């Protein structure tokens, strides 16, 4: 029933090992020496303190080089999410985006840049990594919602002409763009068809990063299948796919739990391929050597919850609740109206 890392962590914490290195609270004992600390201990419960253990303990594997139960957890998550590799990140998707872009983009590389991108992508792609942006214009719909990228921005001739303004030589290359960064789902809920994005611009890019901070559930809902970059059938001429997800936003995770999915095995042997060693060097640049194991365990458990038919039923139930809530609002409310089409399947 339990996934690999959480299973080992829960058994380990029950053993009650003494820790002579760190954390200094020693399984919560230090907190118990003061009324404020005792109140905190009793509020959170003993297991959260017993699960906060030193990263030097070999029983749970190394989270930085990905071995043991830690590696098993990420391998399991990759299987659940249809990725080639998955990396658990414990300081948010701002960090996940920084890891990806640091691994992919070098100074002077051209980056196709969605104007809806999160600030972390601006900071990592354009400042830290010194990429050169070709901005993809975005729009708002009549309701003021943050919409998608304007259609003309997916035209190859237009993109090459914009790239030529920045770097005339790269604009002529078969793949002028090292990376495209697309917000798969905007803050207001506009979601792309990932297949269409890849069909339109994939042949121009080495990699596409889909920032999925506000989504991540699309591949578990049949009607949203085409929105999932991780369900694409990729060939050697396709771009590598990278997906970052804020598990704490729409799935089961503590705040700051995030993950990176890497789907690029179809690029192996090509010059543009980024291997695990290079990618993990970027990962370690942003990872702490003192990880909080309950965060890692939450990512592990989240993958278990999404797995198989049980996970799909959770999302089917969620969709049903959303539909019924809209019906109730339409029937009972005068001042509130959900944003739905006036006609669905020919019915008003």
Language-model segment annotations:
Residues 5, 91-106, 112-333:
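Conserved PLP-enzyme active-site core in the AAT-like
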Residues 46-95:
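Conserved N-terminal alpha-helix of the aminotransferase class I/II PLP-enzyme fold
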Residues 36-42, 85-88, 162:
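Short acidic/polar alpha-helix capping motifs at helix-coil junctions
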Residues 29-32, 46-51, 55-58, 190-191, ...:
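Short N-terminal helix-initiation segments at or just after the protein's N-terminus
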Residues 1-50:
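N-terminal glycine-rich, Lys/His-bearing helix-loop that initiates the first secondary-structure elements
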Residues 84-86, 108-111:
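Short active-site oxyanion
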Residues 324-348:
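Hard-cation-handling environments
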Residues 34-51, 221-239, 339-348:
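Charged, glycine/proline-rich intrinsically disordered loops and linkers
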């Amino acid at each position: 029933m339990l996934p690999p890392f959480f299973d080992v962590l829960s058994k380990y914490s029950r053993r009650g090992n003494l820790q002579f290195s760190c954390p200094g609270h020693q399984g919560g004992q230090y907190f118990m020496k003061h009324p404020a600390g005792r109140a905190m201990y009793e509020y959170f419960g003993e297991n959260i303190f017993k699960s906060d253990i030193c990263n030097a303990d070999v029983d749970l594997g190394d989270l930085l080089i990905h071995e043991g139960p830690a590696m098993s957890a990420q391998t399991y998550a990759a299987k659940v999410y249809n990725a080639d590799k998955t990396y658990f990140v414990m300081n948010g998707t701002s960090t996940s985006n920084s890891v990806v872009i640091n691994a992919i983009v070098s100074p002077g590389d051209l980056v196709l840049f969605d104007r809806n991108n999160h600030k972390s992508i601006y900071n990592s792609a354009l400042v830290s990594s010194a990429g050169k942006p070709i901005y993809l214009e975005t729009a708002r719909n009549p309701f003021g919602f943050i919409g998608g990228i304007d259609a003309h921005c997916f035209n190859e001739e237009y993109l090459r002409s914009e790239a030529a303004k920045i770097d005339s030589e790269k604009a002529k290359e078969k793949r002028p763009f090292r990376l495209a960064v697309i917000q798969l789902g905007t803050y207001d809920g506009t979601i792309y068809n990932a297949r269409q994005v890849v069909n339109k611009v994939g042949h121009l890019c080495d990699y596409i990063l889909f920032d999925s901070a506000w989504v991540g559930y699309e591949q578990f809902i049949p009607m949203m299948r085409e929105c999932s970059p991780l369900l694409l059938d990729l060939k050697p001429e396709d771009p590598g796919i990278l997906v970052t997800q804020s598990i704490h936003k729409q799935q089961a995770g503590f705040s700051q739990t995030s993950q990176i999915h890497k789907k690029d095995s179809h690029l192996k042997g090509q010059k543009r391929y980024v291997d695990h060693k290079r990618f993990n060097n970027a990962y370690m640049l942003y990872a702490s050597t003192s990880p909080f194991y309950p965060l890692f365990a939450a990512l592990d458990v989240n993958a278990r919850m999404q797995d198989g038919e049980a996970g799909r039923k959770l999302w089917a139930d969620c969709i049903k609740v959303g539909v019924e809530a809209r019906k109730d609002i339409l029937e009972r409310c005068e001042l509130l109206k959900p944003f739905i089409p006036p006609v669905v399947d020919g019915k008003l």
